[in-house]
Amino acid sequence: MFENEKRMAAMEALKFVRNDMRIGIGTGSTAYYFIEGLSELVKNGLRITGIPTSKKSEELCRSFNIPVDYNIKDIDIDFDGADEFDPYGNLIKGGGGALVREKIVAYNSREFYVLVDHSKYSERLHKFPLPVEVLPFMSEKTLENIERLGCRASFRDDKKFISDNGNYIIDCVFSYTDPELESQIKMIPGVVEVGIFRHLSTKIFQGTIDGCRIIDVK
């Protein structure tokens, strides 16, 4: 439904890629359009090194002959999608199950550019369940402890979904996903990472019906 808007956001973000950059390459449907467009630039002589945030994105990069290297200390820009964002640049991420690697790459990048369609905007984060990656060990108890914070929680695909790190994803439905919940949830033993991304995004590329709006996050 919003495929053209996702493509618009990806194409606009690609204009910021320069020779010899080391870039984070995200996961998901919008990131696919970015990878597809990046492959054309590489084919035409652009020199970059990519740090994919999931095995799926790594496979895509390699199939498009995009150089990949995980042994990079400094990342210039991370390009990734989001499930939801608010006016302050807070994000919900992890719908594709790659939130741990996505957060590692975003945190270690000088800039974090978020590519979305117009439907991903919310005044308050509430539309998308909050993904939380947890260790399999005593995971039922971890879920119970998360629910004590006031949400309805369930294992993604009844534990059939396994992250690239070998863990489960718990999807949490809050009436409002307060960004402050990130630290509270991370204090629960068994929690690996939380899909709230605070103070990380620097630009948001929001695809629209007739172009792309670039939002500078203050």
UniProtKB/Swiss-Prot annotation:
A biological process term (GO) from this entry: D-ribose metabolic process
Keyword match Isomerase: yes
Alphabetically ordered keywords of this record: Isomerase
GO molecular function annotations of the record: ribose-5-phosphate isomerase activity
EC number(s) on file: 5.3.1.6
Gene Ontology CC, one term: cytosol
EC class name: isomerase
Domain of life of the organism encoding this protein: Archaea
Biological or metabolic pathway of the protein: Carbohydrate degradation; pentose phosphate pathway; D-ribose 5-phosphate from D-ribulose 5-phosphate (non-oxidative stage): step 1/1
Active site location: E102
Stored Pfam families: Rib_5-P_isom_A (PF06026)
Cited CDD domains: RPI_A
Residue numbers binding substrate: T27, G28, S29, T30, D80, G81, A82, D83, K93, G94, G95, G96, K120
Reaction catalysed by this enzyme: aldehydo-D-ribose 5-phosphate = D-ribulose 5-phosphate
Job description of the protein: Catalyzes the reversible conversion of ribose-5-phosphate to ribulose 5-phosphate.
Family, similarity comment: Belongs to the ribose 5-phosphate isomerase family.
UniProt subunit comment: Homodimer.
Protein name: Ribose-5-phosphate isomerase A
Source organism phylogeny: Archaea, Methanobacteriati, Thermoplasmatota, Thermoplasmata, Thermoplasmatales
Gene label: rpiA
